[in-house]
Protein backbone atom coordinates (compact mmCIF):
# COMPACT_ATOMS: atom_id res chain seq x y z
CA UNK A 1 0.00 0.00 0.00
CA UNK A 2 0.87 3.65 -0.13
CA UNK A 3 3.20 5.01 2.55
CA UNK A 4 3.32 8.69 3.49
CA UNK A 5 5.73 10.40 5.88
CA UNK A 6 4.43 13.64 7.38
CA UNK A 7 7.13 16.11 8.38
CA UNK A 8 6.91 19.03 10.77
CA UNK A 9 9.16 22.07 10.29
CA UNK A 10 11.16 23.86 12.96
CA UNK A 11 10.09 27.35 11.93
CA UNK A 12 8.24 29.47 9.39
CA UNK A 13 7.47 29.76 6.57
CA UNK A 14 6.59 26.05 6.12
CA UNK A 15 3.88 24.29 8.08
CA UNK A 16 4.08 20.59 7.17
CA UNK A 17 5.24 18.39 4.29
CA UNK A 18 3.95 15.04 3.01
CA UNK A 19 6.49 12.72 1.39
CA UNK A 20 5.42 9.59 -0.50
CA UNK A 21 7.91 6.84 0.39
CA UNK A 22 6.01 3.92 -1.11
CA UNK A 23 9.18 3.37 -3.12
CA UNK A 24 11.86 4.23 -0.53
CA UNK A 25 14.41 4.64 -3.31
CA UNK A 26 12.36 7.44 -4.83
CA UNK A 27 10.80 9.63 -2.14
CA UNK A 28 8.49 12.26 -3.57
CA UNK A 29 7.02 15.40 -1.99
CA UNK A 30 3.27 15.31 -2.65
CA UNK A 31 2.18 18.21 -0.44
CA UNK A 32 3.77 21.16 1.36
CA UNK A 33 1.89 23.90 3.18
CA UNK A 34 2.78 27.33 4.55
CA UNK A 35 2.07 28.81 7.96
CA UNK A 36 -0.39 31.72 8.04
CA UNK A 37 2.01 33.93 10.04
CA UNK A 38 5.79 34.31 10.28
CA UNK A 39 5.73 34.60 14.08
CA UNK A 40 4.69 30.98 14.62
CA UNK A 41 5.95 27.45 14.14
CA UNK A 42 4.50 23.95 13.94
CA UNK A 43 7.41 21.69 14.89
CA UNK A 44 5.24 18.89 16.32
CA UNK A 45 2.65 16.74 14.56
CA UNK A 46 1.13 13.28 14.94
CA UNK A 47 -1.04 11.11 12.72
CA UNK A 48 -3.54 8.37 13.53
CA UNK A 49 -5.45 6.82 10.67
CA UNK A 50 -6.70 9.64 8.46
CA UNK A 51 -6.42 12.33 11.14
CA UNK A 52 -3.38 14.53 11.75
CA UNK A 53 -2.87 16.83 14.74
CA UNK A 54 -0.51 19.80 14.36
CA UNK A 55 0.84 21.99 17.19
CA UNK A 56 1.09 25.76 16.74
CA UNK A 57 3.36 27.82 18.98
CA UNK A 58 4.00 31.55 18.64
CA UNK A 59 7.27 33.37 19.25
CA UNK A 60 5.73 35.62 21.89
CA UNK A 61 2.77 35.43 24.23
CA UNK A 62 -0.53 36.94 23.20
CA UNK A 63 -0.12 36.26 19.47
CA UNK A 64 -2.39 34.24 17.20
CA UNK A 65 -2.94 31.61 15.96
CA UNK A 66 -1.75 29.51 18.88
CA UNK A 67 -3.18 26.07 19.51
CA UNK A 68 -3.78 22.76 17.76
CA UNK A 69 -5.31 22.01 14.36
CA UNK A 70 -6.80 18.73 13.14
CA UNK A 71 -6.62 17.72 9.49
CA UNK A 72 -8.26 15.07 7.34
CA UNK A 73 -5.33 13.47 5.48
CA UNK A 74 -7.24 10.75 3.65
CA UNK A 75 -6.08 12.48 0.47
CA UNK A 76 -2.41 13.29 1.21
CA UNK A 77 -2.18 15.68 -1.72
CA UNK A 78 -5.04 17.76 -0.34
CA UNK A 79 -5.22 17.76 3.47
CA UNK A 80 -8.36 19.45 4.78
CA UNK A 81 -8.69 21.32 8.05
CA UNK A 82 -11.30 19.78 10.35
CA UNK A 83 -11.05 22.05 13.37
CA UNK A 84 -8.79 24.40 15.30
CA UNK A 85 -8.44 24.27 19.09
CA UNK A 86 -7.56 27.79 20.24
CA UNK A 87 -5.05 28.10 23.09
CA UNK A 88 -4.16 31.76 22.60
CA UNK A 89 -4.23 34.27 25.44
CA UNK A 90 -2.24 37.03 27.16
CA UNK A 91 0.07 34.50 28.86
CA UNK A 92 0.02 31.85 26.13
CA UNK A 93 2.33 30.82 23.29
CA UNK A 94 0.14 27.87 22.33
CA UNK A 95 1.23 24.25 21.96
CA UNK A 96 4.87 23.15 22.01
CA UNK A 97 4.43 19.40 21.54
CA UNK A 98 1.63 16.89 21.17
CA UNK A 99 1.06 13.13 21.25
CA UNK A 100 -1.76 11.42 19.32
CA UNK A 101 -1.69 7.67 18.76
CA UNK A 102 -5.12 6.27 19.64
CA UNK A 103 -7.41 8.41 17.51
CA UNK A 104 -9.28 9.58 20.62
CA UNK A 105 -7.10 11.88 22.73
CA UNK A 106 -4.44 14.47 22.02
CA UNK A 107 -1.98 14.87 24.88
CA UNK A 108 -0.08 18.13 24.68
CA UNK A 109 2.40 20.48 26.33
CA UNK A 110 0.42 23.66 26.05
CA UNK A 111 -0.48 27.05 27.40
CA UNK A 112 -4.07 28.10 28.03
CA UNK A 113 -6.00 31.39 28.00
CA UNK A 114 -6.94 30.94 31.67
CA UNK A 115 -3.53 29.88 32.99
CA UNK A 116 -1.50 32.67 34.64
CA UNK A 117 1.99 31.41 35.56
CA UNK A 118 3.82 32.55 38.68
CA UNK A 119 6.88 33.12 36.47
CA UNK A 120 6.77 34.13 32.78
CA UNK A 121 8.83 31.08 31.76
CA UNK A 122 6.43 28.58 33.36
CA UNK A 123 3.63 28.99 30.82
CA UNK A 124 3.10 25.45 29.46
CA UNK A 125 1.70 22.36 31.18
CA UNK A 126 -0.01 19.05 30.43
CA UNK A 127 -3.45 19.05 28.78
CA UNK A 128 -5.60 16.17 27.52
CA UNK A 129 -7.94 16.98 24.63
CA UNK A 130 -10.82 14.72 23.59
CA UNK A 131 -10.93 14.51 19.78
CA UNK A 132 -13.36 11.62 19.39
CA UNK A 133 -15.49 14.19 17.62
CA UNK A 134 -12.68 15.80 15.60
CA UNK A 135 -14.86 18.72 14.58
CA UNK A 136 -15.31 19.71 18.24
CA UNK A 137 -12.19 19.07 20.34
CA UNK A 138 -12.72 19.62 24.06
CA UNK A 139 -10.39 19.59 27.05
CA UNK A 140 -10.85 16.64 29.40
CA UNK A 141 -8.15 17.30 31.96
CA UNK A 142 -4.93 19.09 32.79
CA UNK A 143 -2.03 19.02 35.24
CA UNK A 144 0.69 21.52 36.10
CA UNK A 145 3.64 21.36 38.44
CA UNK A 146 2.48 22.72 41.81
CA UNK A 147 3.69 26.25 42.46
CA UNK A 148 3.86 27.32 38.83
CA UNK A 149 0.37 28.84 38.59
CA UNK A 150 -0.86 31.95 40.34
CA UNK A 151 -3.29 30.96 43.06
CA UNK A 152 -1.54 27.70 43.95
CA UNK A 153 -1.27 27.00 47.67
CA UNK A 154 2.35 25.96 47.12
CA UNK A 155 5.46 28.12 47.07
CA UNK A 156 6.92 28.64 43.57
CA UNK A 157 9.99 26.49 42.91
CA UNK A 158 13.44 28.12 43.13
CA UNK A 159 14.92 29.27 39.83
CA UNK A 160 17.86 27.51 38.22
CA UNK A 161 21.00 29.59 37.53
CA UNK A 162 20.40 28.83 33.85
CA UNK A 163 16.65 29.36 33.98
CA UNK A 164 14.80 27.55 31.18
CA UNK A 165 11.46 27.40 32.93
CA UNK A 166 9.35 24.95 34.91
CA UNK A 167 7.12 23.99 32.03
CA UNK A 168 6.06 20.93 30.06
CA UNK A 169 8.15 20.05 27.02
CA UNK A 170 7.05 16.53 26.03
CA UNK A 171 4.14 14.33 27.11
CA UNK A 172 4.33 10.70 26.00
CA UNK A 173 1.42 8.26 26.37
CA UNK A 174 2.33 4.83 25.00
CA UNK A 175 -0.32 2.44 23.65
CA UNK A 176 0.88 -0.26 26.06
CA UNK A 177 0.06 2.02 29.04
CA UNK A 178 -2.73 4.41 28.07
CA UNK A 179 -3.23 5.17 31.77
CA UNK A 180 0.23 6.73 32.14
CA UNK A 181 1.64 10.01 30.90
CA UNK A 182 5.43 10.43 30.94
CA UNK A 183 5.89 14.17 31.22
CA UNK A 184 9.18 16.01 30.66
CA UNK A 185 9.15 19.34 32.50
CA UNK A 186 12.47 21.06 31.58
CA UNK A 187 13.79 22.58 34.87
CA UNK A 188 11.17 20.59 36.79
CA UNK A 189 12.62 17.23 35.73
CA UNK A 190 10.22 14.44 34.77
CA UNK A 191 6.85 13.33 36.12
CA UNK A 192 4.82 10.16 35.72
CA UNK A 193 1.09 10.86 35.81
CA UNK A 194 -1.82 8.50 36.35
CA UNK A 195 -4.32 9.47 33.65
CA UNK A 196 -6.72 6.55 34.05
CA UNK A 197 -9.22 9.26 34.97
CA UNK A 198 -8.37 11.77 32.28
CA UNK A 199 -10.39 14.49 33.94
CA UNK A 200 -8.18 14.24 37.04
CA UNK A 201 -4.53 13.43 36.25
CA UNK A 202 -2.53 12.57 39.38
CA UNK A 203 1.21 12.54 40.01
CA UNK A 204 2.62 9.07 40.70
CA UNK A 205 6.33 9.83 40.82
CA UNK A 206 8.95 12.29 39.71
CA UNK A 207 12.64 12.68 38.98
CA UNK A 208 14.14 16.08 39.59
CA UNK A 209 17.39 17.99 39.97
CA UNK A 210 16.12 21.25 41.39
CA UNK A 211 18.72 23.74 42.62
CA UNK A 212 17.72 23.69 46.28
CA UNK A 213 17.30 20.51 48.29
CA UNK A 214 15.64 22.56 51.04
CA UNK A 215 12.63 23.38 48.86
CA UNK A 216 9.73 21.15 49.80
CA UNK A 217 6.23 21.03 48.43
CA UNK A 218 3.56 21.96 50.94
CA UNK A 219 0.59 20.36 49.22
CA UNK A 220 0.12 18.25 46.12
CA UNK A 221 -3.40 19.53 45.50
CA UNK A 222 -3.70 22.49 43.15
CA UNK A 223 -6.70 24.17 41.58
CA UNK A 224 -7.29 23.19 37.98
Task: Label the model's feature ranges.
Residues 1-224:
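Feature marking well-ordered beta-strand scaffolds used for ligand recognition
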Amino acid sequence: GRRIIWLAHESAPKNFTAVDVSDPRKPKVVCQTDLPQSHMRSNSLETCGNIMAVAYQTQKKGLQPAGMELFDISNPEKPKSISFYDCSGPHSRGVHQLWFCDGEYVHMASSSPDFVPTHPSDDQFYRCIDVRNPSKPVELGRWHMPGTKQGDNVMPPPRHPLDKGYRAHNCNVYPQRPDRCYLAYIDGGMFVLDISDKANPKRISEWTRRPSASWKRQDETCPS
